[in-house]
């Protein structure tokens, strides 16, 4: 059953739960020692922390709500709504870490959210192919592996100062792939039942990509302040998901003439807002405890 209203409501609930889980896992990352020992591994340190598992449980609930939303609406409807998690995460992070958001941060975060909202309201997305052929998937998967692998190497060995930002982009891109695979898996389940999920590769690819995204996300949290990595994740995920929704699933925006200009401006505002947020840091050093 297609219902954009239900899709938006479930996506909004997902955004709310994403925010809390993100803040919890980032606080754990800030407590991780950076002495090069095995104990300093962001992933191992997180796995040994009960609150991380609480945060992950919240993240799983958020993902379940996102999946339900995808059952009611297209990827191009659900994905932009999830960017609202940024509006909830930044104030929560400020509250838990004992600092105050600047007006400029609030301005850019609001502008980012408004821009994404314009894209969904003006775009009026149409559904695509519920089960695209494999030859549509292979090129985008190969390109994704090459680009994200290259970005990881840059963050590790070349652009260490911007490691949190770059890993945030990689995380967002991975979850963009997760979003598309989620939509494909949901459509498989709706049309073919559990047998369709078992006999097709999309469900297994979804699990693998989601696991990889969670690991990279924890490393991005450990690499720096939340204001560095979170905006990058927030902007990369819908852009990658939009692109794959067009290329793989065949979903389309109902946009004509001047509306394309408005959509382009909204996309530009999204990018500028993300850069502005990623370059702003209000968390005092003393809060990293």
Swiss-Prot record:
Keywords from the named record: Cell membrane, Membrane, Transmembrane, Transmembrane helix
State if Membrane is listed as a keyword.
yes
Q: What residues form the membrane-spanning segments?
A: 4-24, 44-64, 68-88, 106-126, 138-158, 166-186, 196-216, 230-250, 258-278
Question: Can you cite an annotated GO cellular component?
Answer: plasma membrane
Q: Where in the cell is it found?
A: Cell membrane
Keyword Iron in annotation: no
Q: Give membrane topology per the record.
A: Multi-pass membrane protein
* PANTHER family listed in its UniProt record: CONSERVED INTEGRAL MEMBRANE ALANINE VALINE AND LEUCINE RICH PROTEIN-RELATED
> NCBIfam families given for it?
DMT_1 (NF038012)
Quote the protein name from its UniProt record: Uncharacterized protein Cgl0250/cg0304
Naturally occurring in which organism (per UniProt) = Corynebacterium glutamicum (strain ATCC 13032 / DSM 20300 / JCM 1318 / BCRC 11384 / CCUG 27702 / LMG 3730 / NBRC 12168 / NCIMB 10025 / NRRL B-2784 / 534)
State the organism's lineage.
Bacteria, Bacillati, Actinomycetota, Actinomycetes, Mycobacteriales
């Amino acid at each position: 059953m297609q219902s954009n209203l239900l899709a938006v409501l479930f996506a909004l609930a997902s955004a709310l739960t994403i925010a809390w889980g993100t803040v919890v896992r980032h606080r754990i990352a800030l407590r991780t020692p950076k002495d090069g020992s095995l104990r300093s591994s962001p992933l191992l340190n997180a796995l040994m922390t009960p609150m991380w598992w609480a945060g992950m449980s919240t993240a799983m609930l958020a993902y379940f709500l996102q999946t339900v939303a995808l059952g009611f609406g297209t990827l191009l409807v659900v994905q932009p709504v999830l960017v609202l998690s940024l509006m909830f995460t930044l104030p929560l992070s400020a509250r838990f870490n004992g600092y105050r958001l600047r007006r400029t941060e609030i301005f850019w975060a609001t502008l980012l959210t408004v821009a994404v909202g314009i894209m969904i309201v003006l775009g009026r997305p149409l559904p695509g192919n519920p089960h695209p052929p494999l030859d549509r998937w292979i090129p985008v998967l190969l390109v994704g592996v090459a680009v994200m692998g290259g970005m990881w190497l840059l963050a590790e060995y070349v652009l260490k100062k911007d490691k949190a930002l770059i890993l945030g982009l990689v995380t967002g891109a991975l979850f963009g792939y997760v979003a598309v695979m989620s939509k494909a898996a949901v459509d498989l389940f709706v049309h073919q039942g559990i047998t369709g999920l078992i006999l097709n590769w999309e469900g297994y690819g979804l699990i693998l990509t989601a696991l990889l995204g969670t690991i990279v996300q924890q490393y991005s949290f450990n690499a720096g302040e939340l204001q560095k990595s979170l905006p990058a994740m927030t902007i990369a995920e819908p852009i990658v998901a939009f692109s794959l929704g067009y290329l793989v699933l065949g979903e389309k925006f109902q946009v004509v003439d001047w509306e394309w200009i408005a959509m382009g401006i909204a996309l530009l505002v999204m990018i500028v807002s993300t850069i502005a947020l990623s370059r702003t840091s209000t968390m005092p050093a003393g809060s990293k405890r």
